[in-house]
Amino acid sequence: MYVIVDIQGQQMKVEQGRRLFVHHIKDVESGASVEFDKVLLVDNNGAITVGSPLVEGAKVVCEVLTPLVKGDKVLIFHKKRRKGYRKLNGHRQQFTEILVKEVVA
């Protein structure tokens, strides 16, 4: 059984027992329980239920494993030819690691 759930603007395929890295969730601690109720699709062993836009009564219960994980550094380099203009910026995205405990459909 799997569901497609909207977590902070991103659609993810979720199954019970799976670990996910989602965009940073503010004000949560390690071991806290988080629920996501924006379920868009439910596949229960071949029986597919598509919401319009959401499936009523379905939710995903997760446990926070690591509240703050930093992703790899992405470098952004700007240059204008023949002018000596060079600029380098970097960015590290913050994530939260969660474990899917239960899928209620």
Swiss-Prot record:
Domain of life: Bacteria
GO biological process, one term: translation
Name used for this protein in its record: Large ribosomal subunit protein bL21
Complex formation: Part of the 50S ribosomal subunit. Contacts protein L20.
Designated gene of the protein: rplU
Gene Ontology molecular function, alphabetical: rRNA binding; structural constituent of ribosome
Keywords for the protein's UniProt record, in alphabetical order: Ribonucleoprotein, Ribosomal protein, RNA-binding, rRNA-binding
Keyword Heme in annotation: no
Record's GO cellular component terms: cytoplasm; ribonucleoprotein complex; ribosome
Coiled-coil positions: none
